[in-house]
């Protein structure tokens, strides 16, 4: 669904574990990291789209998470023309997103990146709430900052303590999904 201003309705998901660390997925066959996100289909509410995207990209079901909150307004970013599907270029400017903050109630083993034919991610990791965003594709970074900042109001003080040092801790090197799986079996 693209609105009259050229923005596709979308949801973004910031998923926390019990240590208030954030889920990051590595884009399949790319060297960039991002949060789960995806388009809102016709007839879907943002909440319904969030649960569908969560299941498609992480394998998690509603029973595995609780909603802590969402952004008050749509957050927007423009997508460079070179990243846009050719048939969309006339009317498409970018994405407008409602961001959800979720707490994971399930376990790490509930996460599965292979729930659909073309997975979005080929690796995942937990990281601190406030990290550098260099590993995020450049045109999404400002929206990530806005979403993290707005939703941080829902977190306890200790989790947000690093706000003045936000985005200074880099994402650690990739740990591939297969390595995680074999480590879990050996341990």
Curated annotation (Swiss-Prot):
The keyword Cell membrane does not apply. Its cofactor is a divalent metal cation. Keywords: Hydrolase. Residues 6-149 form the Nudix hydrolase domain. It is an enzyme of class 3 (hydrolase). It holds the Pfam family NUDIX. One of its GO terms (molecular function) is pyrophosphatase activity. The keyword Transport does not apply. Its EC number is 3.6.1.-. It comes from the Bacteria. A motif (Nudix box) lies at residues 38-59. Belongs to the Nudix hydrolase family. RppH subfamily. HAMAP family: Nudix_RppH (MF_00298). Accelerates the degradation of transcripts by removing pyrophosphate from the 5'-end of triphosphorylated RNA, leading to a more labile monophosphorylated state that can stimulate subsequent ribonuclease cleavage. This is RNA pyrophosphohydrolase. It comes from Nitrosomonas eutropha (strain DSM 101675 / C91 / Nm57). The gene is rppH.
């Amino acid at each position: 669904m693209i609105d009259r201003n050229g923005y596709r309705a979308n949801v973004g998901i910031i998923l926390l574990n019990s240590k208030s660390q954030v889920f990051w997925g590595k884009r399949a066959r790319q060297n960039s990291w991002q949060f789960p996100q995806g388009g809102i289909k016709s007839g879907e509410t943002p909440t319904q789209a969030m649960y569908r995207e969560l299941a498609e990209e992480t394998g998690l079901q509603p029973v595995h998470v609780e909603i802590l909150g969402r952004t008050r307004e749509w957050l927007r970013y423009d997508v460079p023309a070179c990243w846009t599907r050719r048939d969309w270029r006339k009317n498409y400017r970018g994405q407008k997103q409602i961001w959800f903050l979720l707490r994971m109630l399930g376990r790490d083993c509930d996460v599965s990146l292979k729930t659909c034919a073309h997975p979005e991610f080929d690796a995942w990791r937990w990281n601190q709430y406030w990290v550098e965003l260099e590993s995020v594709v450049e045109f999404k970074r400002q929206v990530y900052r806005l979403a993290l900042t707005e939703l941080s109001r829902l977190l306890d003080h200790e989790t947000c303590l690093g706000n003045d040092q936000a985005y200074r801790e880099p994402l650690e090197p990739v740990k591939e999904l297969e390595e995680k799986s074999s480590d879990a079996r050996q341990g």
